[in-house]
Swiss-Prot record:
Gene: Hddc3
MF-aspect GO terms: guanosine-3',5'-bis(diphosphate) 3'-diphosphatase activity; metal ion binding
Alphabetic keyword roster: Acetylation, Hydrolase, Manganese, Metal-binding
InterPro entries: HD/PDEase_dom, HD_domain, MESH1
Lineage, top ranks: Eukaryota, Metazoa, Chordata, Craniata, Vertebrata
Function: ppGpp hydrolyzing enzyme involved in starvation response.
Superkingdom of origin: Eukaryota
Binding site for Mn(2+): H35, H61, D62, D122
Residues at the catalytic site: E65 (nucleophile), D66 (nucleophile)
Name recorded for this polypeptide: Guanosine-3',5'-bis(diphosphate) 3'-pyrophosphohydrolase MESH1
Amino acid sequence: MGSEAAQLLEAADFAAHKHRQQRRKDPEGTPYINHPIGVARILTHEAGITDIVVLQAALLHDTVEDTDTTLDEVELHFGAQVRRLVEEVTDDKTLPKLERKRQQVEQAPHSSPGAKLVKLADKLYNLRDLNRCTPTGWSEHRVQEYFEWAAQVVKGLQGTNQQLEEALKQLFEERGLTL
């Protein structure tokens, strides 16, 4: 597909197209694409990640879970390695929400190194977003519950990337949580 820059832009363009009708749950209703771009940016700028497969997976991490995208489609455009990472970080939306959350906690320690990086950056982005503003319809109690659940997931991802883990640890400590 050409240079790594071209591959990254292809993934960003694909994700932007797939998420084009979606908005974040913040009061401003920011475009959803800001989230996967932000996750990829955390990986490059804060964790020092340059692995193109991991960065493409970060950009695509919610396409299968939250749009009509299939894993076969991801593989067709981006290859088997990207597909595997996206598959690892995709929740099964046919399951009830509590079961999906339980599975994330249970499966975190068994994830591949690349999937662990995407999960850490995803949690970091979401937790920073929650600190920035409460999503529409969320109580402060629900925000705290999300932090508590995220801390359980992150516990299973420890030993992956010191920079991301330190940033997350600080956010948890501000909420009275420890890993």
